[in-house]
From Swiss-Prot:
Residues 400-476 form the B5 domain. Residues 698-791 form the FDX-ACB domain. One of its GO terms (molecular function) is magnesium ion binding. PROSITE patterns: B5 (PS51483), FDX_ACB (PS51447), TRBD (PS50886). It catalyses: tRNA(Phe) + L-phenylalanine + ATP = L-phenylalanyl-tRNA(Phe) + AMP + diphosphate + H(+). It comes from the Bacteria. GO terms for cellular component: phenylalanine-tRNA ligase complex. This is Phenylalanine--tRNA ligase beta subunit. It is found in: Cytoplasm.
Amino acid sequence: MKFSEQWLRGWVSPQVSRDELVARLSMAGLEVDSVTLAAGIFTGVVVGEVLSTEQHPDADKLRVCQVSNGRETFQVVCGAPNVRPGLKIPFAMIGSELPGDFKIKKAKLRGVESNGMLCSAAELQAGEGNDGLMELAADAPVGQDIRVYLGLDDASIEVDLTPNRGDCLSVAGLAREVGALYAADVTRPQIAAVSAVHDEVRPVEVLAPAACPRYLGRVIRNVDLSRPTPLWMVERLRRSDVRSIDAAVDITNYVMLELGQPLHAFDLAEINGGIRVRMAEEGEKLVLLDGQEVSLRADTLVIADHQRALAIAGVMGGEHSGVTAGTRDIFLESAFFDTISVAGKARSYGLHTDASHRYERGVDWQLAREAMERATGLLLDITGGEAGPVIEVVSEQHLPSIAPVTLRASRVEQMLGLVIENAEIERLLTGLGLTVSAEADGQWRVDVPSHRFDISLEVDLIEELARLYGYNRLPVRYPQARLAPQANAEAKGDLPELRRLLVARGYQEAITYSFIDPKWFELFSPGVKPLLLANPISNDMAAMRASLWPGLVKALQHNLNRQQDRVRMFESGLRFVGQLDGLKQEPMLAGVVCGSRLPEGWAQGRDAVDFFDVKADVEAVLGFAGALGEFTFTPGQHPALHPGQTARILRDGREVGFLGAIHPELSKNLGLDRPVFVFELVLAEVATGRLPKFHELSRFPEVRRDLALLADRDVSASAVLDVIRENAGEWLTDLRLFDVYQGKGIDPHRKSLAVGLTWQHPSRTLNDDEVNATTLAILTSLEERLNATLRK
């Protein structure tokens, strides 16, 4: 909203400077974006009158003018096409200084002396008109300083309003705010009802009362739109960033800026029959005032006559029914359109107008009659004419209703952190036009006026009090609460610690979208029905993820495309399994790895990361809560993973995750030219462990046996280790696989596994007979169950 400071001060004028006013508005939530001077800096320019003109003897386009400043007559040479006797214009006399440090001196133009300069609006930086002189009103006082006459010691102030403050999209609304801020009186213009001098009306039918609960119309005959808009109105419009068009349009724009009620004037001769406010017919055509033809949709409210649509309600009028210089009779419209019926319609047709901007944010539903009378009075004063009666159609049941709000002083103190006196609370709210009635000590009933459709709750009133009292006056008080530290279960690992663990192992945390491309969903979860969004951001973000891998792999692609060859990322987040009925949202921890095992350095090679490197990272995560022994890795199958490099992770028989290399076909489809490894774990299982139990350290020596075993190639090392554990007895303290060999000297269908076993008794020394007997039992069981034998 852009407005003239002088216009505002005509309504309410607190005794403060412009800078202070601007700062106070911003602190009250009406953020000032810019302050622009109404004209450039100049001096010595007065209202002049052209007494006579003669053709320049040596220049076809120049005229020699005699110009009066009210006391003397001066000869001035001028080339403006609109210079003529009797014209009153800005006259820069000798010694004047115009914007840009341009000083007026006596000069000769083509041999003829010129004593001054006749000015255009552009030369004074008081408008854009540079195609001729700035024409002043016929009654302009000759000799008066032009800055005083036009009120150019003014500024245009632009405020950036939040969408809920549609009530401030007018000088009246801003004046109400300023009056409340400074406890200053607001002087509204006296708007009298205009008496009808003829009885012509056009019938009005509102066929969509929910969208248009109130519609007013009036016929005004015999207007003369050739009459110019008064300069004072043109200037107020200009300083509000509105271009002057003709008297009828200027007046409707002026009233909209002044009161906040959009209006529209139709050429009465172009209305067939009466007015119908209805929904458009699908595909109905309308050529708008800007010349654009639109194909209307059935959800668009239109103003129509008995044959065709005339305007998009609350947005823009039609070209064929618009007023022109030849219009003699007009039909003036003032209506209240429901916010929902207008919201988004302008944008859907590629439009944005001052009217739609206001209707989308809400217009005072009681304002239509006052705006109608104001516009009628201005039209009759400026263009002449004869007003008819106002026809009004109202659907009371569809008009907004605002319930009273209860305000408690205790709640004000609680939310703002200070005590505001009861009288001050009443004064501040009353200044905004609210009706405040005391119900009890420290409690009020507040009736909200029709222009404040954003107030419906007690907190809304408290916000208004904070704005008016001054945010900068509110005390700084930190929240006070009794915070008792929660006891964390020792057997529970928390996510921040898991994050730190992975970061310590060289990973970086990634955060990706929960919604992914349905095509990627199919690649990683083939055969699974995705949960699709009803209104996605874009087509490639239309499915909720069933795994964290798609987002991580996409982030991996992004890094690889930017020459980042070593990538190690992890993410924690939800996966979404199933449809809305029975949807399961499960916290997961996932990672993606590719590139070298270690960062590049002189002391370490560039060996590529492999399955077992990533498995070690996963084991570190699984062991974080102290329950690594409860997890097992078994060969598994996953449609997104390499069939020979996939591990299924189990805990007590429950599947809790997967680890493996991306399937070669999937890698090819995704353009990945190197091995990529991923893992994904159910976070709840990872974070749940067991408390460690202390066992007294044995003082007796350990006994170690190393066994080289031959097993079939398809026998997993974990199966061998499980059999060993089952038969090694209770004193086994350590078991590890330290070598795997396949090749020369070994049956091509077999492999060699070297394991180390360590026993230690807590209270005595173990002898060789005991260890040998246990070793024999292990070998016997391995041969019987896995066909694994001792290598000789």
